[in-house]
Design a protein with these regions (language model features):
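Extended repeat-based scaffolds of very large eukaryotic assembly and lipid-transport proteins
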Residues: 1-133
């Protein structure tokens, strides 16, 4: 991928896998999903607050983000599902804060993919294709 190439969407299979992961958690832990949805929405609301920085990472310097991180890696399938909506690209920071398995992280040394959040967003969905949660 070159610098000005369009950012490709995740494959249909990866998108379907993200939906399946969300649905599995919704069936097995509906209260977790409810709590996650409430916390994620509260965090989304903070994204529109004025900040003193143009850096997207500043959206993580809020209590709402910390509450999501405290929920632990059990919410990873829910985060991947949220990344299907490109408006939720800030969720990349939440995913990276929760994921501990390097096989499912976008390589930070791959600067083009790591620094472009939308690209990282789509790669996260893709690398989780078929993952057993």
């Amino acid at each position: 991928m070159r610098a000005h190439d369009a950012i490709p969407s995740p494959s249909r299979a990866a998108q379907d896998s993200a939906v399946q992961g969300y649905n599995e958690v919704r069936r097995s832990a509906p209260e977790l999903v409810k709590a996650f949805e409430e916390c994620f929405h509260a965090w989304q609301v903070t994204w529109d607050r004025p900040t003193h920085s143009s850096q997207a990472a500043t959206r993580c310097d809020v209590d709402e983000f910390d509450k999501l991180v405290e929920m632990g890696p059990e919410i990873l399938p829910l985060v991947v599902y949220k990344l299907l909506d490109s408006r939720n690209f800030t969720g990349v920071f939440l995913y990276n804060a929760l994921e501990t398995d390097e096989r499912y992280l976008v390589d930070p040394s791959d600067v083009l993919n790591f620094l472009v959040l939308q690209r990282q967003n789509n790669l996260i969905i893709e690398i989780n294709l078929g993952r057993q949660w």
